[in-house]
Amino acid sequence: MGTGPKYKRILLKISGEALAGEQKTGLDFGVIGQVCDVIKTCTELGVQVGVVIGGGNFWRGVKNGEGRMARSRADHMGMLATVMNCLAVSDVMEQKGIPVRVQTAVEMSTFAEHYTWERAVAHLEEGKVVLFGAGSGCPYFSTDTAAVLRAAEIGADAILLAKNIDGVYSADPHVDPSAVKYDAITYDEVLAKHLAVMDLTATSLAMENDIPVVVFALADPQNIVRAVMGEPVGTVVTK
């Protein structure tokens, strides 16, 4: 392995819950600051970074709607939650001197740029971090699917999936103590074994576009740098 980063352009997916830290809801600016510091390290290594952030720390469309409101409207609220997170993260990045742009799938020009892949790529090539808000802009599609979509559009070398678990397991390790962690696995195996990496739509899209996914725990934000460098961390999912 060389001394430089393994991946030159990445799409980092961070759940909204991760930004809430121990409090589970809202924003933990200590956690956000740590994540921003690590992203800054990546950019200083010459890595171009796009980020999709979930919104579950404020609102989860399907779960919070509980069938008492239209699914599309509940998902629209989830999209707005992701934009709130993007604005918070971008503010912390600006305080730290990190060049950043927020782009949203739904036009809201007062807050952010409207997403186009051409403009996103131009920002990345100029060394800016691009935060993608509002998911894919369509209800019924998860932010994991939005992350894979954006990764494909910007030509990312890999998707870094920062979760609350340190990789892909044969079963839920919180339920089954005999669950085995995979260091590497194929998309076909993930689909055949119904493993909880991403939802089916996101997994299929990543496989179709041959984009590797690195699944790791965000509990130690330095795992982001380790993943970028190609060091053993979490689970690598490939075609």
Range-by-range predicted roles:
Residues 1-239:
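C-terminal catalytic "cap/lid" subdomain
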